[in-house]
Amino acid sequence: MKKGINRVVLVGTGAVGCSYAYSMINQGVAEEFVLVDVNEAKAEGEAMDLSHAVPFSPSPTKVWSGSYADCKDADLVVITAGLPQKPGETRLDLVEKNTKIFKQIVRGIMDSGFDGIFLIATNPVDILTYVTWKESGLPKERVIGSGTTLDSARFRYMLGDYLDVDPRNVHAYIVGEHGDTELPVWSHATIGVQKLETILANNEQYKQEDLDKIFENVRDAAYQVIERKGATYYGIGMSLLRVTKAILNNENSVLTVSAYLEGQYGEKDAYVGVPAVINREGVREIVELELNEDEKAKFAHSVKVLKETMAPVL
């Protein structure tokens, strides 16, 4: 890392990577931003285009297309490269294809002398974050996946819409796999300072079956978007930006990232979406929510599915 200069390297300039890159320039988060892609011309073109937006950014950012060698002085490497999810394909269906790609990418990055933090977004994100941790040899705290940050954002947006409340005042989490086995933590959902269950008990117009439908829409949101426009990228781009800001600004923010469990929630040796405190060192600590029995069972099932899917590719 270069003292006093925040450098972020993005590996993968597809739709997700470029949405993240645009968000980064739009908010002026890093002083140096490097784009790397197997398609060098694409990375170069994106860097040129982004550079032309810098005069409108809140703060200047030096943007260029580079190579894995640029990772040597990076504080953060964000990986969005990999094969995208096709219509009808689950995130877990991608595991074998993207694991092979990822191992090559991580080795190339580590050969540069990189000693910063990894942030992974490629699906299946929990498994590929684990693969990155194993391949890199970095401390578990410095390998993070986007986890259920986007799912939690979708959850808060839809709950806010249903209750007619600013989603920024909705405090609710989706945990587990970023995918079909994820689960809502209803027992800890609050609107402002009031428990969601209290609001339901005191207002006849709000019903649990409506909330259950909201969760189904959260869980299946990616499928719905992919069916209509081919891919999701704005939401995950902003999610990655949020985690990036928490890291570079040493915020100690609580975000539902994919973090390594070693006994928390009764699970170990798995990366999975849970609330965690994020700062300049990566994951400072995991926030262990007291789940009810139903939530515990669903969380255990989610981790079990991840481990079973991951086993053949490790």
Curated annotation (Swiss-Prot):
GO terms for cellular component: cytoplasm. One of its GO terms (biological process) is glycolytic process. The lineage of its organism: Bacteria, Bacillati, Bacillota, Bacilli, Bacillales. This is L-lactate dehydrogenase 2. Substrate binds at residues 85, 91, 123-126, 151-154, 232. HAMAP family: Lactate_dehydrog. Pathway: Fermentation; pyruvate fermentation to lactate; (S)-lactate from pyruvate: step 1/1. It is an enzyme of class 1 (oxidoreductase). InterPro entries: L-lactate/malate_DH, L-lactate_DH, L-lactate_DH_AS, Lactate/malate_DH_C, Lactate/malate_DH_N, Lactate_DH/Glyco_Ohase_4_C, NAD(P)-bd_dom_sf. GO terms for molecular function: L-lactate dehydrogenase activity. It holds the Pfam family Ldh_1_N. The active site is at residue 178. Allosterically activated by fructose 1,6-bisphosphate (FBP). CDD domains: HicDH_like (cd05291). SUPFAM superfamilies: LDH C-terminal domain-like (SSF56327), NAD(P)-binding Rossmann-fold domains (SSF51735). Catalyzes the conversion of lactate to pyruvate. Homotetramer. Disulfide bonds: none annotated. It comes from Bacillus cereus (strain ATCC 14579 / DSM 31 / CCUG 7414 / JCM 2152 / NBRC 15305 / NCIMB 9373 / NCTC 2599 / NRRL B-3711). The gene is ldh2. It catalyses: (S)-lactate + NAD(+) = pyruvate + NADH + H(+). Keywords: Allosteric enzyme, Cytoplasm, NAD, Oxidoreductase, Phosphoprotein. It comes from the Bacteria. It is found in: Cytoplasm. The modification Phosphotyrosine is found at residue 223.
